[in-house]
């Protein structure tokens, strides 16, 4: 589905729909506040975004799983299986299942690591752990309230950003930006070439403005904005010194080398993380 043009600008139509977006956003905030998520024994890494549509989540999830395997772990993917008829939990078998069964992206994920399709995310995560997963990588699901996450990465299109800044149906956002980013430990800005750096600078300024003092994402935005824009790209790509993020469920044993490799190897992406700058 093609996104409406008014999602990219604050047109009269978008402004007219804005009250509905506020109601939608408040509903999303209430759901998160009332959530009592289920925790599995393996760490859960969620690759999500704040807007509808693709923003590089699946390639990012693939990169994370590839690096986890390189570190000797047994990652399994977990996804809802949009576009497929199977509710799951079911382990995707590319030799048996089709896109009509599980959707397109699970077939792509299953070529790299075991992939589970489950509309019931806790049940899918439990199935993955029972099948030998020592870490679960969720492709999408940042707004899902039923499964506890140990690490959340928000993938943002560095050029499109958050569109007109309105929540559905007035804009592309699934929830208020500040609400979503308060639950993440890193922002992955996926962009093309150097032309996206100005958009990245705008994103950093937005992050700095919406977060309270002491928030880790605000801290890194503050630090990066002290650099010249030409330096930002180089500094993010060469970010070393990444430390554990204080996650639960044993994730702290996985995440430091994961983030180090993530910064070095994720092609075309810029990782904004508070430990990236000493």
Residue ranges and their predicted role:
Residues 1-44:
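A transmembrane-helix-recognition feature enriched in membrane-embedded lipid enzymes
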Residues 17-21, 33, 43-49, 53, ...:
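P-loop NTP-binding module
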Residues 21, 59, 63, 123-126:
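A broad detector of short, well-ordered amphipathic alpha-helices
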Residues 32-97:
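Walker A (P-loop) phosphate-binding motif
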Residues 81-83, 87-194:
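Phosphate/Mg2+-binding loops and adjacent switch elements
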Residues 196-278:
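Intrinsically disordered, low-complexity segments enriched in glycine and mixed charged residues
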């Amino acid at each position: 589905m093609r996104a409406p043009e008014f999602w990219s600008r604050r047109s009269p139509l978008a402004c007219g729909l804005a009250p509905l977006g506020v109601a939608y956003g408040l509903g999303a905030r209430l759901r998160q506040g009332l959530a009592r998520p289920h925790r599995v024994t393996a760490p859960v890494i969620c690759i999500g975004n704040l807007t509808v549509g693709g923003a590089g989540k699946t390639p990012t999830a693939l990169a994370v799983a590839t690096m986890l395997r390189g570190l000797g772990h047994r990652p399994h993917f977990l996804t809802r299986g949009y576009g497929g008829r199977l509710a799951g939990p079911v382990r995707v078998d590319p030799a048996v299942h089709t896109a009509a069964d599980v959707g397109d992206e699970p077939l792509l994920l299953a070529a790299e690591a075991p992939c589970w399709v489950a509309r019931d995310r806790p049940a899918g995560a439990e199935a993955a752990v029972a099948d030998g997963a020592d870490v679960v990588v969720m492709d999408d699901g940042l707004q899902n309230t039923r499964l506890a996450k140990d690490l959340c990465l928000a993938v943002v299109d560095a050029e499109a950003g958050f569109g007109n800044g309105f929540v559905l149906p007035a804009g592309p956002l699934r929830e208020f930006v500040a609400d979503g980013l308060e639950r993440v430990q890193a922002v992955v800005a996926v962009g093309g070439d150097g032309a996206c750096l100005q958009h990245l600078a705008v994103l950093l300024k937005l992050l700095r403005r919406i977060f309270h003092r002491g928030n880790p994402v605000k801290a890194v935005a503050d630090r990066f904005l002290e650099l010249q824009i030409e330096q930002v790209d180089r500094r993010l790509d060469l970010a070393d010194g990444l430390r554990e993020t204080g996650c639960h469920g044993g994730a702290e044993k996985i995440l430091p080398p994961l983030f180090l490799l993530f910064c070095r190897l994720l092609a075309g992406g810029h990782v904004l993380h508070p430990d990236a700058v000493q």
